[in-house]
Amino acid sequence: MAKSDVIEVEGKVTETLPNAMFRVELENGHEILAHVSGKIRMHYIRILPGDRVTVEMSPYDLSKGRITYRFK
């Protein structure tokens, strides 16, 4: 999958789940499951409920995504 096929949206973390998974509510009202990208995991960036994040989603499965950025 090429990088250009990725859909980037902003959302808010509503719930933390086991195995570094999060439930994220997107700006358009949809809720998805998202996991943490490797760079965020590598730099020990904590993600808590209420944080605003950027999520990358595949056009093939719009119910899952990857958290790529946490806003300050």
From Swiss-Prot:
Occurrences of domain S1-like (ranges): 1-72
Gene Ontology MF terms: ribosome binding; rRNA binding; translation initiation factor activity
Family annotation (CDD domains): S1_IF1
Keywords: Cytoplasm, Initiation factor, Protein biosynthesis, RNA-binding, rRNA-binding
One GO cellular component term noted in the UniProt record for this chain: cytosol
InterPro entries assigned to the protein according to its UniProt record, in alphabetical order: NA-bd_OB-fold, RNA-binding_domain_S1_IF1, S1_domain, TIF_IF1
Cellular localisation: Cytoplasm
Gene3D superfamilies in alphabetical order: Nucleic acid-binding proteins
SUPFAM superfamilies in the cross-refs: Nucleic acid-binding proteins
Highest taxon above the source species: Bacteria
Family: Belongs to the IF-1 family.
Purpose: One of the essential components for the initiation of protein synthesis. Stabilizes the binding of IF-2 and IF-3 on the 30S subunit to which N-formylmethionyl-tRNA(fMet) subsequently binds. Helps modulate mRNA selection, yielding the 30S pre-initiation complex (PIC). Upon addition of the 50S ribosomal subunit IF-1, IF-2 and IF-3 are released leaving the mature 70S translation initiation complex.
NCBIfam families: infA
Complex and partners: Component of the 30S ribosomal translation pre-initiation complex which assembles on the 30S ribosome in the order IF-2 and IF-3, IF-1 and N-formylmethionyl-tRNA(fMet); mRNA recruitment can occur at any time during PIC assembly.
The protein's name in its UniProt record: Translation initiation factor IF-1
